[in-house]
């Protein structure tokens, strides 16, 4: 299982990559492993204002449907339209296949996210339970 050191994570297995005031959001390798084969992604709309903790996307796999929760508040400025035609990209490259980019309204919310070394331990524990 892969955890990248240049990202921040949530307990719900989303990752955040920050570029200035923009944050790219996706699902972690741990999440895509739990979901198994992803068959559909319901993307948010550009210009949607989403608060931290709100659902911003729904991911359907052969196992289940799972909501993805926004790790930081702000306005959606970009969506990864490739996922409409190729949702399996989240399985193939979970860290290269972001779901949405958000213009953050409060960068201080980043401080509440999980550091890579801590997230890696969380995933290792989940692997042991599986």
UniProtKB/Swiss-Prot annotation:
InterPro entries: 2-oxoA_DH_lipoyl-BS, Biotin_lipoyl, GCV_H, GCV_H/Fam206, GCV_H_sub, Single_hybrid_motif. The keyword Cytoplasm does not apply. Residues 22-103 form the Lipoyl-binding domain. It comes from the Bacteria. One of its GO terms (cellular component) is cytoplasm. GO terms for biological process: glycine decarboxylation via glycine cleavage system. Signal peptide: none annotated. Keywords: Lipoyl. Its cofactor is (R)-lipoate. Coiled coil: none annotated. Binds 1 lipoyl cofactor covalently. The modification N6-lipoyllysine is found at residue 63. The glycine cleavage system is composed of four proteins: P, T, L and H. The glycine cleavage system catalyzes the degradation of glycine. The H protein shuttles the methylamine group of glycine from the P protein to the T protein. NCBIfam families: gcvH (TIGR00527), PRK01202.1 (NF002270). Belongs to the GcvH family. This is Glycine cleavage system H protein. It comes from Clostridium botulinum (strain Langeland / NCTC 10281 / Type F).
């Amino acid at each position: 299982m892969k955890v990248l050191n240049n990202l921040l994570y949530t307990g719900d297995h989303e990752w955040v990559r920050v570029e200035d005031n923009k944050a790219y959001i996706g699902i972690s390798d741990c999440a895509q492993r739990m979901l198994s084969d992803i068959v559909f992604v319901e993307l948010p709309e550009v210009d949607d204002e989403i608060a931290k903790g709100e659902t911003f996307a729904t991911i359907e796999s052969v196992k289940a449907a799972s909501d993805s929760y926004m790790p930081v508040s702000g306005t959606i400025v970009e969506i990864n339209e490739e996922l409409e035609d190729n949702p399996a990209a989240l399985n193939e490259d979970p860290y290269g296949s972001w779901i949405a980019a958000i213009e953050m309204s409060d960068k201080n919310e980043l401080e509440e996210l999980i550091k890579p070394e801590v997230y890696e331990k969380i995933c290792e524990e989940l692997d042991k339970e599986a």
